[in-house]
């Protein structure tokens, strides 16, 4: 018997986060008072959650937590800040400011590029938080709504080659970001000492904001570097003779799930149809407001847009969006994705400018022994005349380099280890979330285990004479999915220290969800299984067949067709 589809909200007692938001005075809470509380390095009560709407998460160093407990000290509370950077574009002048702050005022001294196409500071103590926001504001950056139950940092394809089309798409990413921002002045009042003026009405987000986090992208086919199926709302650029004419709209993607709860699952976004440029902002607001009103505020595990679509039906949700936006979606315009990895090295744009994409393993910019990456980026920022573009794959593009400056930029990149011809294709196609020691949700290592684990995979590929091939490999330390493992050919999801669930069967284009193959296994067990599977792939693959396609064709794993119904099928 099929489940009845009922448009509208979920009835029942609301989750406590709804009380928290309702009583927060439009996200102010008592954050300002907490900043001067000398008894704790953390935030009290509701403020622990409310700071997320201001772009921060309270964390601690889990490596030293037992030691501090033994000394009868509280955890070393600090915050991680995620900047709002629509489309990932940052100037060299801004970079120099964030470099200095990371060096002088963070516990780890690093800049972390993330899968949300922005940067994060890790390990900022409470005494430096207000100064951090003021420092960022002085250079035109904020962290409004990069976390919490709001629309978060808007991603855009990092593709400066088609410079005119990319510029148009980037401008739309900025417009969408601004249109969907919270209107409350809480951020300005608390962090920038702004005057309290009132006028906190939230016409799009509502007084209780959204039921859960909401993620938006703008993507230029054929390059799916933003992984649209990981996001709630996606605008796929449709061009005519190189000129942007509108977008196909896809709604309801998302990768997070909960171990042991089969009501949670990753889901691909659904095609709603085409909209011209004149209706983009209305459609964005209509999708957000429909999710605002119909999303599940009773059970946060089922609160994201993907679950709303499954509960009410795609057609009902789409019709409601059309009604609210005052439009009708046109037929889906043809488009195709052929890749999603970054194009490393130099490329020349149609404007004659040059762009150098750097591989930054796990997005971590730090001065490592023999590879002073952070210093290298600072030295480049001092002389670069264009801008920097952060990618959703945690890499960085030095964009807009004049021909006469190529040699100097490349020399600096090589001098500091930012450009290394010895990096394998496999390493370039691998990434992980931060996980331990800073993420409080991590169940297993991710960023810290990935480099050595990739070396082991490189060894397996070489053993089977596939050293020039690569598998899209991703690790996420918990099932929330920041590392986007649920769109990888081989995805590891942390289950416990040293143990992971092994998923297989994604594809190169990022349009297929991998299925659970083995559960709760150790790294040596994973490598043994991959050894056998890569051996079969080497022996039996069709010409050019990627690993994810092979394991499905060979019957090793069944494809996920409709994840709401078959993700957990045997």
From Swiss-Prot:
Q: How is the cofactor bound?
A: Binds 1 siroheme per subunit. Binds 1 [4Fe-4S] cluster per subunit.
* Enzyme Commission no: 1.8.1.2
> Listed disulfide bonds for this chain?
none
Keywords noted in UniProt: 4Fe-4S, Amino-acid biosynthesis, Cysteine biosynthesis, Heme, Iron, Iron-sulfur, Metal-binding, NADP, Oxidoreductase
GO terms for cellular component: sulfite reductase complex (NADPH)
Q: Which residues bind siroheme?
A: 482
Entry's PANTHER family? SULFITE REDUCTASE [NADPH] SUBUNIT BETA, SULFITE REDUCTASE [NADPH] SUBUNIT BETA-RELATED
Q: How does it assemble?
A: Alpha(8)-beta(8). The alpha component is a flavoprotein, the beta component is a hemoprotein.
Family assignment from sequence similarity: Belongs to the nitrite and sulfite reductase 4Fe-4S domain family.
Could you tell me what this protein is called?
Sulfite reductase [NADPH] hemoprotein beta-component
Primary gene name: cysI
């Amino acid at each position: 018997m099929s489940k009845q589809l009922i448009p509208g909200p979920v009835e029942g007692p609301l989750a406590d986060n709804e009380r928290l938001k309702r009583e927060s005075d439009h996200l102010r809470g008592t954050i300002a008072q907490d900043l001067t509380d000398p008894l704790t390095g953390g935030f009290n009560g509701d403020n622990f959650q409310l700071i997320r709407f201001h772009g921060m998460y309270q964390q601690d160093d889990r490596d030293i937590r037992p030691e501090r407990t033994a000394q009868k000290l509280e955890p070393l509370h600090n915050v991680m800040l995620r900047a709002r950077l629509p489309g990932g574009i940052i100037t060299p002048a801004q970079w120099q400011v964030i470099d200095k702050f990371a060096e002088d005022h963070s516990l780890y001294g690093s800049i972390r590029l993330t899968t949300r196409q922005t940067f994060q500071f890790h390990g900022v103590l409470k005494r430096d938080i207000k100064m951090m926001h003021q420092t960022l504001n002085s250079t035109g950056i904020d962290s409004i709504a990069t976390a919490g139950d709001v629309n978060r940092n808007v991603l855009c394809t990092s593709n400066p080659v088609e410079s005119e089309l990319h510029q148009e798409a980037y401008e739309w990413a900025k417009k969408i970001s601004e249109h969907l921002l919270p209107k409350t002045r809480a951020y300005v009042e608390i962090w920038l000492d702004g005057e309290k003026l009132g006028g906190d009405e939230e016409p799009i987000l509502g007084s209780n904001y959204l039921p859960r986090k909401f993620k938006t992208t703008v993507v230029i086919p054929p390059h799916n570097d933003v992984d649209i199926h990981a996001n709630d709302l996606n605008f796929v650029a449709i061009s005519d003779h190189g000129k942007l004419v509108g977008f196909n709209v896809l709604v309801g993607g998302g990768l997070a799930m909960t171990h042991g709860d089969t009501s949670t699952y990753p889901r691909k976004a659904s095609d709603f149809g085409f909209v011209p440029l004149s209706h983009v902002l209305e459609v964005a607001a209509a999708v957000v407001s429909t999710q605002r009103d119909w999303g599940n505020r009773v059970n946060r595990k089922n609160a994201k847009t993907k679950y709303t679509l499954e509960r009410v039906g795609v057609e009902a949700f789409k019709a409601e969006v059309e009604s609210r936006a005052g439009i009708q979606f046109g037929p889906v315009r043809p488009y195709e994705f052929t890749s999603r990895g970054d194009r490393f090295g130099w490329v020349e744009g149609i404007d004659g400018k040059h762009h150098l994409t750097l591989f930054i393993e796990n997005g971590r910019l730090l001065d490592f022994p023999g590879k002073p990456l952070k210093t290298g980026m600072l030295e480049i920022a001092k002389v670069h005349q264009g801008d920097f573009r952060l990618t959703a794959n945690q890499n960085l593009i030095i964009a807009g380099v004049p021909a006469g400056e190529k040699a100097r930029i490349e020399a600096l990149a090589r001098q500091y280890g930012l450009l290394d011809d010895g990096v394998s294709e496999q390493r370039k196609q691998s990434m992980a979330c931060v996980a331990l020691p800073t993420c409080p949700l991590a169940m297993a290592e991710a960023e810290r285990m990935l480099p050595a684990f990739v070396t082991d995979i490189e060894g397996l590929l070489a053993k089977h004479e596939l050293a020039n091939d690569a598998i899209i490999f991703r690790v996420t330390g918990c099932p929330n999915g920041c590392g986007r493992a649920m769109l990888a050919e081989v995805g590891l999801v942390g289950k416990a220290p040293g143990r992971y669930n092994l998923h297989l069967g994604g594809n190169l284009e990022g349009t297929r969800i991998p299925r659970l193959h083995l559960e709760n296994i150790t790294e040596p067990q994973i490598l043994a299984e991959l050894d056998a599977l890569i051996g079969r792939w080497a022996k039996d693959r069709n010409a050019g067949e990627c690993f994810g396609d092979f394991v499905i064709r060979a019957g090793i794993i069944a494809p996920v067709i409709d994840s709401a119904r078959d993700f957990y099928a045997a």
